[in-house]
Structures are given as structure tokens and as C-alpha cells.
Amino acid sequence: MQIAIVLYPSFTALDFIGPYEVLRNLPDTEVRFVWHEPGPVTADSGVLMVGATHSFDETPSPDVVLVPGGPGTTMVARDEKVLDWLRQVYPGTTWMASVCSGSVVLAAAGLLDGKRATSHWSVLSALKLMGATPVGDQRIVRADPDGKVITAAGVSAGIDLAMWLAGQIGGEAKAKAIQLMIEYDPQPPFDSGHMSKASAATKASATALLGKDMIKPEPLKAGVLLAWDQAVRRVRGRRSA
């Protein structure tokens, strides 16, 4: 089984590292980190770099695709090479998954039109703008009851998503063994990990932390252009109807 994890500049590291640690332990599995070309890709920290092992052209038929999120989402969601690859490989995949704002990329590729999806709380409104039905109260959302598109909420939810996929692919016993092997038994010392639980002050602080990355020139410009693209798409859709 081949698992392709999409990398791009300014991805969030935990979005893919958590799922990678789970999925790489499935039997007979090859994990690829894919981008336009092999080589280092810099995370949103500006310090951490991860090596893309394969290009999109070298990965024409993955069984599982996972798209992480991060401040670079708005830029990659306008990258036609990435979107075309997602559309091309989709029919042959067993699972098409995203973590955090990676669901915005799936939506930009047209894979979430009219479907249920989740994401980081800060971009749920963007999913609606892009034709999906946002779900903010679930960690893992299956787009259709029997479908193969799975989206996870923000950042740490990627581990839950990967554990779910491990159960679907390798069976419950294997998934439980992986869970114990990585000692995934979350017991956070604070209970503010969802908007429904956080205080107003915590929400304000978290929003400010996000803003440090999102107001940088490139993500900000790309976000505006992405919103423009979707507005034009809706207008053209109404005219052709």
C-alpha cells in the first residue's frame, strides 16, 4: 500500500508528523512525501525542513492521500499542479484525507462540493465559501456515509484521523497495537482544546497566535486571491445554470 503525504511550503509539522508515525507502522506500507520535486520543504516555523521524497509525477497511483494544513494552505489551494494531481489520483485511491486546513485544498480541487467536512476552527467559514458543508463539532468527518474522503479538525486531530484509518486498513487489533506502541493516551492538563470549551480570553489569545502567520504577505495575498477565485466560480455557476 502506498501512502502519499503532500508537503508544501509553510505546512504545519504536527499535521503530518502525527499521522505519519501512525500510518508508517501499517504492514506492507510505503509512505511518500510528495511535492513538485524531491527536496527540502520548509514548515511554517521557518526552521524545520522536511524532505519531499517524490514528485507528483512520480506518484500517479497512491492508495491513500493525506493533505496537511498550515499557513501555506491558501497558496497551495491555488496551485493548479497540486489540484490537478489530486483530481487525477482520486478515482484510484482507497482514502483521500486531510488534516486541519488541508481540507481547503481538497475543496479547491472540487472533492468536497456539497459534502460534509471539517477543518481548523479558523477556516470553517472558508469551507462553506468553497461549497462544502462545514462541521465544527466533530474531530473526524466522513464526507459521505460510505465515501472515501475523510477530513480531520485542527492539527492534533490528525492523530485521531490516522488511528481511524489504521483501523480501517489494518484492522482494530493492529490499530490498537500501534496506539500502544506510540503510547497515544491523551490526558491534557487543560480542557480548552475546542472552541466550545475555551474562555473568551483563551479564544482571543489563540486567534492572535494564528494571526502571526496568517498576516504575513504571501499567505494574506493568497487568501484574498483564493476568496476571489471562489466568488468568480459562484457567479459563473449562477450564469450557466
What residue spans do the PLM features occupy?
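A short glycine-threonine-serine/GTX helix/turn-capping micro-motif
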Residues: 146-154
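A conserved active-site-flanking secondary-structure segment within enzyme catalytic domains
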Residues: 112-142
